[in-house]
Curated annotation (Swiss-Prot):
Stretch list, region Involved in autoinhibition: 1-104, 1231-1309
Compositional bias per record (Polar residues), positions renumbered to this chain: 30-44, 1307-1323
Region named Involved in phosphatidylserine substrate recognition: 237-238
Localization annotation: Golgi apparatus, trans-Golgi network membrane; Endosome membrane
Binding positions for a 1,2-diacyl-sn-glycero-3-phospho-(1D-myo-inositol 4-phosphate) per the UniProt entry: K1149, R1219, W1223, K1224, Y1235, H1236
InterPro entries from the UniProt entry: ATPase_P-typ_cyto_dom_N, ATPase_P-typ_P_site, ATPase_P-typ_TM_dom_sf, ATPase_P-typ_transduc_dom_A_sf, HAD-like_sf, HAD_sf, P-type_ATPase_IV, P-type_ATPase_N
Binding site for ATP: 560-562, 655, 698, 700, 703, 721, 755-756, 835-837, 928, 934, 957-958
CDD domains membership: P-type_ATPase_APLT_Dnf-like
Effect on the protein upon substituting F511Y: Normal ATPase activity. No sensitivity to cold
Protein's recorded name: Phospholipid-transporting ATPase DRS2
Organism, scientific name: Saccharomyces cerevisiae (strain ATCC 204508 / S288c)
GO MF terms, alphabetically ordered: ATP binding; ATP hydrolysis activity; ATPase-coupled intramembrane lipid transporter activity; magnesium ion binding; phosphatidylcholine flippase activity; phosphatidylethanolamine flippase activity; phosphatidylinositol-4-phosphate binding; phosphatidylserine flippase activity
Amino acid sequence: MNDDRETPPKRKPGEDDTLFDIDFLDDTTSHSGSRSKVTNSHANANYIPPSHVLPEETIDLDADDDNIENDVHENLFMSNNHDDQTSWNANRFDSDAYQPQSLRAVKPPGLFARFGNGLKNAFTFKRKKGPESFEMNHYNAVTNNELDDNYLDSRNKFNIKILFNRYILRKNVGDAEGNGEPRVIHINDSLANSSFGYSDNHISTTKYNFATFLPKFLFQEFSKYANLFFLCTSAIQQVPHVSPTNRYTTIGTLLVVLIVSAMKECIEDIKRANSDKELNNSTAEIFSEAHDDFVEKRWIDIRVGDIIRVKSEEPIPADTIILSSSEPEGLCYIETANLDGETNLKIKQSRVETAKFIDVKTLKNMNGKVVSEQPNSSLYTYEGTMTLNDRQIPLSPDQMILRGATLRNTAWIFGLVIFTGHETKLLRNATATPIKRTAVEKIINRQIIALFTVLIVLILISSIGNVIMSTADAKHLSYLYLEGTNKAGLFFKDFLTFWILFSNLVPISLFVTVELIKYYQAFMIGSDLDLYYEKTDTPTVVRTSSLVEELGQIEYIFSDKTGTLTRNIMEFKSCSIAGHCYIDKIPEDKTATVEDGIEVGYRKFDDLKKKLNDPSDEDSPIINDFLTLLATCHTVIPEFQSDGSIKYQAASPDEGALVQGGADLGYKFIIRKPNSVTVLLEETGEEKEYQLLNICEFNSTRKRMSAIFRFPDGSIKLFCKGADTVILERLDDEANQYVEATMRHLEDYASEGLRTLCLAMRDISEGEYEEWNSIYNEAATTLDNRAEKLDEAANLIEKNLILIGATAIEDKLQDGVPETIHTLQEAGIKIWVLTGDRQETAINIGMSCRLLSEDMNLLIINEETRDDTERNLLEKINALNEHQLSTHDMNTLALVIDGKSLGFALEPELEDYLLTVAKLCKAVICCRVSPLQKALVVKMVKRKSSSLLLAIGDGANDVSMIQAAHVGVGISGMEGMQAARSADIAVGQFKFLKKLLLVHGSWSYQRISVAILYSFYKNTALYMTQFWYVFANAFSGQSIMESWTMSFYNLFFTVWPPFVIGVFDQFVSSRLLERYPQLYKLGQKGQFFSVYIFWGWIINGFFHSAIVFIGTILIYRYGFALNMHGELADHWSWGVTVYTTSVIIVLGKAALVTNQWTKFTLIAIPGSLLFWLIFFPIYASIFPHANISREYYGVVKHTYGSGVFWLTLIVLPIFALVRDFLWKYYKRMYEPETYHVIQEMQKYNISDSRPHVQQFQNAIRKVRQVQRMKKQRGFAFSQAEEGGQEKIVRMYDTTQKRGKYGELQDASANPFNDNNGLGSNDFESAEPFIENPFADGNQNSNRFSSSRDDISFDI
């Protein structure tokens, strides 16, 4: 298989298939016999041991069998015996030298390992007598089925390490990456397996648990500098005689903030936990020894060593070794799109020795064990050994089916669970749910530091001023006892006092307000019916609400293909036969016409059928050959359903679509036998059987597949299908008259993103075939370079072909994908598609979904070595630099890079080159990439640029990519929920990204930006008056306002305007945001939030605070503030005036920045002022008498009873806000932003003439595309490349009867049964041979014989 990803190591010639030559671990095996020794070179004379192996060491197998076995068990499972310098480890899996037969020595453990083992032993009970531990003895008891029921409880109760690993870390006690001792799994012995403490099948995607919530939550909250700042302030307030305010005001407010944040985090994590619970409670069928049958259990209850039954279309619940299946020789088909993104089905096959276990009775009698590698993250390797009846059977990736795969085209399989839960390879490739911080939050943290610097400056000015004033006026202020005061101590005390006094410049309610805003924004996103997918009853779910504003600033989208952009459903769309193009439904503008002697457009499939059935039509023989090729030249297996229909089992979805297309056109493939295929001609009811002589299989080098048939009339024909490039060069130069028309049709297909194949044939004489067949057979039996020699043999016969036509298959897209991608690109978002599929497939999808277009130049990087990749990248960079590309030119570039080249390009020395080329392209497609490479690509762009990234996928193979991006979006698909559970946002369809980003993203970013800026502004506007006041009170640290009133400012009186703006404000309507995607660039450019904008708001707050302080102090200092009784206002009355005026100004500012007034806006802005005006007299009347706030005693009559107070509340706010109003007027009238213009259009419902211009430009572009020379012809074909397809299809005889669930039912139909002499006439009377695995029943003992000549065995 031409694949850049990790593949399992191949065995060297001459290596034995067994994992051990001597079975140390089989408790049923006797070691008695002649005295023998095993050295570490016993298995293979060519084996070169690693440096740490001691070649001289041997084990005497006959000295003391029991002691030897105990020693091996001790080293293998417990690693406690380190008295000797070397501990033997049976079957240690070494990644450097794949020699599973060897017995290896490992280095003695280091200090830390010994310490860890000491702890383990300390918490494990020991026997009073003998060297063996309590645990070891119970292991021996387990192997002899003598374990009492209380053992597991006692073991887990006292082994702290196992308890911690199992219930806290949810992992196995073995090595984290599979480098430790191999695990032993006993078949049909759950008690023995339970003793090892293997992980259960529980999975969790939550951020917290009971043990980690508090530390993780506090770490997350106090990583926000504002919360850390107020924690310090709260501590300072507790120092006696320092705080000018109440000591509990800050800590009380901080606790409220933390409690609200904690509640929000808990609610979101509970949602994740519920989602996990839904998956964990999925059901599977587990073989029960107690019931002698399969019983339904939850996934979470599946344990290592369980035998499970999986039916067709069901997901695999855990990493499983296939034991048997309903198909011949234990074959099964699995879909791994959820794991690696590949669309073609994979073929897995059980070992022949286990394929006989096909019913409950045989499973019950299955005894043995598996020695398996430890859990690890490698998706493409596996090593293990199964021991059955003293025979050791090697296990490889061919028998391993991973969790996350789905069983297809196979009625059922039986499997042995090897890894569960977080030990499965799928979960090993997943990372812990990361804690992500938004770009806005990072800016806030930096600006808080800057604001803190300003705060320090203000504190220093005030503290130094107080020291100077105290020193200079000490003699005049003798009553203050300032003489002899320690200046350093005074400075330090003043520093702390002013810290507390000015600390509210940083809004303490900022983050809780923002968190609540984001929570409700997330709720509104989830409530949007436009983002609800009715077909699967799936709403959009925001799992991490703290990231919603990131949706408005995305510059790159990294998307999976299969299941995200496409449905993974292939449909036969059109075909070209004899120069004519046929399609089922013809678009109005595509009807076939003749222009300049050339037929343009499509004909209907009905016309094709008419021509086929008209013997006088010259195209009839060609159409017959074309449809016969579709029905015969493939590796598909037909399967009759209960309703009489046929379901085609196809490893390649393309082949399935082609065969189905042929059936729809009247040539129905109905029977496959080992040496023939049968086709039903529906028009006449005639069945034609074609003898299958040879199959020349598809691979990525050949790009074609051929089959040779003997027709019913005795003639021999070769059918060939493949890429246009390879078919054209093999055509007969004289007998091909349809080439030009066919190529023209291929170009039309490619422009529509359809997957194309060329079809050709030739007649072969008997003599030529016999001569070639001898060459082919010789190549098929050679041991060296067999694949290359088979390809050479195929080349000899695949010549002088006659082109008969071409096919077009549509890889059906998800709804709305092309329109969504086009709109997102108009919004300035670059889209990268990362897929495990082949290059041709990826390019075709790029064309069909409008990621690529005909006028784009493809920059293809498909190299085999690092040096070639570097050279290719540098050549492209130099070429692009020479042309001095404009923006328009860059919009015509697309990069296509394959997985192998990408692996080289991701190296530190080359990644800058890759990113340079990629940034110049409008679109990037990475094909044949592994899940790890997907994540590495995202991390590279994330690390090398300041852009915000979004990753979207639907499969488990996309989880790492999703978690690596700033925002991860998972599609709640039909095949699994792993991506959706691990994502920040779960959606039902890719098309929902359009509104999610353009509307909700833009709204969220603008709302959050204004809410944050406003929060800082309002605190600056009020609390800076405290700083101005120090110049009037001799730097004494006296506060203008009462303590609790200051705290209530953020909690009650100004909290609602930013909240309402953050939740309900709309700067542009959703309709216009979707209509003009260019508005999205406002977020990408940081138009609403930046350092410059932030300090503009802060300075505005300084300005407003100065106006309030100066205005009020002039009024009160000069005695203008008289109440109705002619009494002058006091200090606290002046403070209330300052406070109330500031509240009115900041509420007025909120009114100016509000874009859309709603009922909530009216409640929030005027309502907040009204709330304060009502609250103050109640508070000032009650609390002083309760001895809580005596400052406000009698203040109400000095304020509410003064006309100057009310006049001040009118004049000063107008004076302060007039500048803001004039600035807003100037910007809109003379320097309008883009969204200002759109707002005017929205307000006055002004129509836009630009659509007509755009339509004209699109028309011009289409004309130019037609006039251009087209090169893309759309070849794509998905097919597994492991080889062996011919062998597989020759195993099948679909005339054999099958039961309800697809199992073989007749002795003559069993591929393992000896020939019992039943002829075709006896077939119906044959007695049932294989028991229905879904029902109990008796079965006679029978002898099986594999279709492999060299293997036979008994039940």
